[in-house]
Amino acid sequence: MWTHPINYDVIVVGAGHAGCEAAFCSAKMGASVLILSSNLDTIAKLSCNPAVGGIGKGHIVREIDALGGIMAEVTDQSGIQFRILNQTKGPAVRAPRAQVDKQMYHIHMKRLLESSPGLHIMQGTVESLLDNENVIQGVTTKEGITYLGKTVILSSGTFMRGLIHIGDLNFPGGRLGDPAATGLSLALKERGFPISRLKTGTPPRLLASSIDFSVTEEQPGDPGVGFVHRSEPFVPPLPQVSCYITHTTEKTKDIIAANIHRSALYGGRIEGIGPRYCPSIEDKIVKFADKERHHIFIEPEGIHTQEVYVNGLSTSMPFDVQYDMIRSVLGLENAIITRPAYAIEYDYVHGNVIYPTLESKLIEGLFLCGQINGTTGYEEAAAQGLIAGINAVNKVLKKPAFIPSRQESYIGVMLDDLTTQILDEPYRMFTGRAEHRLLLRQDNACLRLSHYGRDLGLLSKERYEIFENQKQIIEEEKLRLSKTFKKYGNSVVSLAKALCRPEVSYDTLREAFPEDIRDYGSTLNASLEMEIKYAGYIDRQKALIHSLSKSENMVIPEDIDYQSISSLSLEAREKLAKFTPRTIGSASRISGIACADIQVLMVAVKKHAHQ
């Protein structure tokens, strides 16, 4: 075993979406960084759908951008269709989504990593961890190299003891075509990490030229929609394409029903729990038997390939059933399968041994991010990578940890949820998880979080000044429009009051009063409209947060002895000792902790402070 001469500040294991974000931000903060991948040709590979964003997820990507991360930038560079979802619904649930070219996404991400000062990229498969007295020292690889590091970030995705299922056939793999990582799971188990299994899946890929698009519904993109916060209109650099919608038929249901016993999921061959909000087609047919059909979305995988992703047909059926099933779908009667669908099981680590910083409680200096923490989705993984990278560097520099709160970000919601809950299914972000989602809109992420990006050294002075200028414009315009009165309809009202009417938009008001309503571009116009139209609701949510902040942010001492607090229920003592929450707010969200327990705990914390 040869030891590499550099002792890195940060070693990142895995170059998926979590690992890339962790490595990039660590290097940008001035650390010496090594990122290890078992295959450099699959850096930032989109293993499942060729898309970024969506409801809740698009909010996270905007937050990553506001903090100085790179997912938004790479998405904009490789996007081949951009949309805003839920445009007819309230502002809290509107979200950007992009169809991306899978190859271009990989190319742009790899290029960014390769050009980052202080960041070294190396091909290698990590087999074990090096630690001394529960402090991380580095990693060893299958290739016989030891790398030393002050901190290590594990972002192993679905590779830890990955097991691929296609009907009654199963074989080890991190994804189809890539080997599984077995050494890491063993290394973590030996060190006392609680590990369980989860499952996810992916649909078949088809040849576009074999599809009859004439019977499908075309779904074009929306103009001017990107992920990076910018002051100028967004013009995508790549040609834009459409997606297409079709649906299953009665024949599809019959094929699945006749072969349900051959599904790896229903045949009892899969022990891991799959994602509730992305079920397989056989799961949908069984659980929603009354539905006559299910929508299928045909999504291009790139502009230089004929392959398309069949969103909605994820399955663990054997290939012969997949073949018949595909050809029962409207427009896919002659479809040619290029890659089979499959399910994959993998190991993940329980959240009770992870701090909200994403540092392990069992080994100092070891951080975990992405699907190893039980999440599903590129966006959730990238956000965790960003947080793990920031906190790894802060640990090396002996600076305070960075933990965004759930009151100010979806990333904060996720961190809090992951470290206060035992997951029974893969964790996916959606807007309903946030208590104050009207404050956490996708359009105002830069206004909420950019000051953190600046302070961390991740956001350039120029970009921060753009965000500050936008914030100033919004505040000044809110005040000016509240003092500008015009006759509108049958009464004289302030323009701010007029904008609060449901049927009035910023654009319609600008058409009526062009001399008074200024045009700041579609993005800033929309933010200004929402800040004014929903001001009453926003103010109430801010007041509620303020009233709860004192107890929410009360810090629980690390050396508190829960077993000695006799007034706590037995379940509360067990759960608090297991999760060791850092604040009263986090403690209150642990399942099984009652309001009475929280009141007792607050008294105990205050007493502890006076001792």
UniProtKB/Swiss-Prot annotation:
Record lineage: Bacteria, Pseudomonadati, Chlamydiota, Chlamydiia, Chlamydiales
Listed GO MF terms: flavin adenine dinucleotide binding
Quaternary organization: Homodimer. Heterotetramer of two MnmE and two MnmG subunits.
Homology family: Belongs to the MnmG family.
A GO BP annotation: tRNA methylation
Names of required cofactors: FAD
Gene that specifies this protein: mnmG
Binding positions (NAD(+)): 274-288
Keywords, sorted A to Z: Cytoplasm, FAD, Flavoprotein, NAD, tRNA processing
Alphabetized PROSITE patterns for the sequence: GIDA_1, GIDA_2
Any single Pfam family the record assigns to this protein: GIDA_C_1st
Gene3D superfamilies recorded: FAD/NAD(P)-binding domain, GidA associated domain, C-terminal subdomain, tRNA uridine 5-carboxymethylaminomethyl modification enzyme MnmG/GidA
Residue numbers binding FAD: G14, A15, G16, H17, A18, G19
Protein name from the UniProt record: tRNA uridine 5-carboxymethylaminomethyl modification enzyme MnmG
Xref: InterPro entries: FAD/NAD-bd_sf, GIDA_C_N, MnmG, MnmG-rel, MnmG-rel_CS, MnmG_C, MnmG_C_subdom, MnmG_C_subdom_sf
Compartment(s) where it occurs, according to its Swiss-Prot or TrEMBL record: Cytoplasm
GO cellular component: cytosol
Main location: cytoplasm
Function: NAD-binding protein involved in the addition of a carboxymethylaminomethyl (cmnm) group at the wobble position (U34) of certain tRNAs, forming tRNA-cmnm(5)s(2)U34.
